[in-house]
């Protein structure tokens, strides 16, 4: 078989290109360098990204994507009938090629049903036969940061190495959007703001303790005058409420009550962000917000946040990274991270000049 690098995608000839994006906020952020490489490879192409609705707002800030299509599953694209209808919609757009950043079998199946002539992605999940350009996934790539996971696939297909840096610029309407959200939730809109994302989608093994988040928040409020804003999904509302209860100072709890765009607008206003390993952590890093990320069960080598002012706190427990949803033992990876550890890192970041200040 001819090596795929010798028969890569003819990017420079493409005029209509589909990209199947990843499903989760953090993964989307980590695909941005790959999207930049695709854009650079196909300067003539109109690039459409197919994504789930809960990440769509993020692409308003991505200059490398022209159009966003929503994959509503659950919803109208659920089941075989829904996937057939989605494939029909894709067929009507006459895409010449599809790059699958998402690994699922169904991503390849839908693009095959859509009759897209060139279909490329990692040959995982039993889908190699459905792809015209399956990329072999070696073990070495799994040990590198996930930014490389996506970028190396595009490079193998013939794309350039455009670097791994990530920086999102807030939308022009973000200041007004953030002001509106903050005032709706009882804030004067005056900072400085400390953002805290105490939840984690994957499971409780990734979550630091509510009382320790609160302790750090209170001390930073006492010493730096920060006002804490809590972020998260509806599922994170209980842990956010627990943090607010534990604190001495009032907090603005936005968990479960904002759109992604509204959350991003407020995050972009934060002076400092404190988070578990989560999608919002990756967003804060991409905005260049000084950031402290608490890692326990997951591996900072592969999913650490971007950003020059991103600090990872981990104790490298002997059982970590276990990548489990719940801890089967004594949760030592998080127990060993103290409020003092996090406060010390936060105080150092808050003592540094803000970006753009002398």
Model region roles, listed by residue range:
Residues 1-358:
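Catalytic machinery of carbohydrate-active enzymes
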